[in-house]
Every structure is written in C-alpha cells, then in structure tokens.
C-alpha cells in the first residue's frame, strides 16, 4: 500500500489497527518467553517496522532526472537480501529446498492466482516489496523447483506470454534477473509489472533504440525469440550474468 498513495489512504486506518494487533501479539509472546512462530523473514521485517513506528512510514517517492527515474522506496529497504547479498561465482546453482523458495507454506496467502498457461502450471504472487506498479512474481511449474536459470522452453513461453498479454493489458511487462544481476531467490520466476510510462531503458535517445547516446550498460534489443535465445545461450556458456525485460511489440 505504501507504493500506491490512493490505496494507502483507503486502507491506512485498517492497516494501523492490524499493525497494533500483531505488535501486541508479538509482545505478549515475548514477555512469556514464547517463540514467534511466523516466518523468520516476516518477523524481522515486522520488528523493523515496530522500531520505525507505523506513523513514520513514508510513501514511495519519485524524481525524474533527464530520462532517468529515481525512486526512494522506504519499504523495499527492509527487504531481506537473501541470495542478492551473497557473492556469485556461477550463473547456475542447484535448487536448495532449505533456502527461501515460492513453495513455502507461509507464502500461500500471497498467491493471487494459480492456473495453467500454455499447458504449464503457474503461480502469480504479489510482491511485498514492490518497485514497479502492480508488481507481481510469476512462477512457472513451481512444484518442479526449477533454479533461477532460464532455458529455451521457458524463454519461449515468456516471450509468447508477453505478446499475448500485451494485447489486453496496456503497459504490461516482465523482467528476469540472473544470479549476480539482482536475483535474490533461486526458484525460477519473473517480475511482472504494469506501467503507464515506458521504462527509462526504452528512451529513444539510446543507441540500442536507434538514438545517438550510449547506454551506461551493454544493452541489446531483440525482436525474434530464437535470435534472443542464441545470445542468451552465449551468455550462459560464458558464465556471464544478465537482466532481461520482456515487452510487447
């Protein structure tokens, strides 16, 4: 709710009441020497919120600087680092059921939708620490425990999904973070979002979009899924991490 002011204004009283209820429950358990039974990550984030106080939480702030979009996101600063805080030596790491993943029972309440896409089971979760509007997490074949390593089959599915969804949902996009490029969870997933404005990387000033200025990072645009996969595969062979943005068009 802190990411969307109109939503927060409608829910703030109920959110504060719920905040007080959980704070009281935690305090009572701790006073009587009883363990807190919620997920450790959730407990740690909530204790940080208690230290900050509900009334001191701030809405996400934006500032445009030339073609760049700057964001101060207080809530996201509380996000557990998980794998994003670890040194990365290899692009692919085996799935570890002992670490955080999207099949944890306490995440069931965060699943917005379960169903099938292109004959594959898919789960859509909301992101508790959003940095884009309508920020979701799309997890294909969640029970197969795929690590966060893209393969040709999933890439083709993601490409098709983007094109199909784009016909009905203006501004939709999907993003993939590899290990060493922002991925914090070793369970195959995409970031899903819906924006009213284009991402800064799409600005026509950049050379990869036909402009005259060089983007600060290496950036390529592909209009064919097979050509894109050939390049992605070459990055895999070179053990080079990367980010992807799937956009309709």
Spell out what each predicted region is.
Residues 119, 169, 185-187:
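Short connector loops at helix/strand junctions that flank enzyme active sites
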Residues 30, 165-168:
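Generic detector of intrinsically disordered, low-complexity, polar/charged segments
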Residues 171-185:
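Active-site nucleotide-donor binding segment shared across nucleotidyl transfer reactions
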Residues 154-166:
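A short, contiguous, amphipathic alpha-helix enriched in charged residues
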């Amino acid at each position: 709710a802190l990411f969307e002011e109109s939503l927060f204004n409608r829910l703030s009283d109920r959110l504060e009441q719920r905040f007080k209820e959980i704070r009281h429950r935690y305090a009572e358990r701790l006073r009587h020497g009883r363990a807190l039974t919620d997920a450790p990550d959730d407990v740690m984030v909530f204790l940080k919120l208690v230290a900050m106080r509900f009334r001191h939480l701030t809405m996400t702030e934006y500032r445009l600087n030339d073609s760049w979009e700057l964001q101060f996101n207080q809530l996201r600063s509380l996000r557990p680092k998980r794998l994003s805080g670890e040194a990365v030596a290899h692009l692919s790491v085996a799935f570890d059921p002992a670490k955080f993943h999207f099949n944890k029972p306490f995440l069931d309440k965060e699943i917005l939708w379960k169903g099938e896409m292109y004959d594959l089971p898919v789960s859509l979760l909301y992101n508790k620490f959003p940095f884009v509007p309508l920020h979701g997490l799309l997890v294909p074949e969640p029970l197969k425990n795929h690590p966060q390593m893209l393969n040709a089959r999933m890439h083709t599915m993601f490409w098709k999904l983007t094109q199909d969804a784009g016909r009905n949902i203006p501004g939709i996009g999907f993003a993939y973070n590899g290990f060493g490029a922002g991925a914090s969870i070793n369970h195959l997933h995409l970031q899903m979002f819906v924006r009213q404005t284009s991402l800064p990387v799409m600005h026509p000033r950049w050379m990869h979009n036909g402009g005259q200025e060089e983007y600060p990072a290496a950036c390529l645009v592909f209009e064919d899924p097979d050509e894109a996969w050939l390049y992605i595969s070459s990055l895999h062979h070179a053990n080079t991490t990367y980010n992807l943005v799937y956009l309709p068009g």
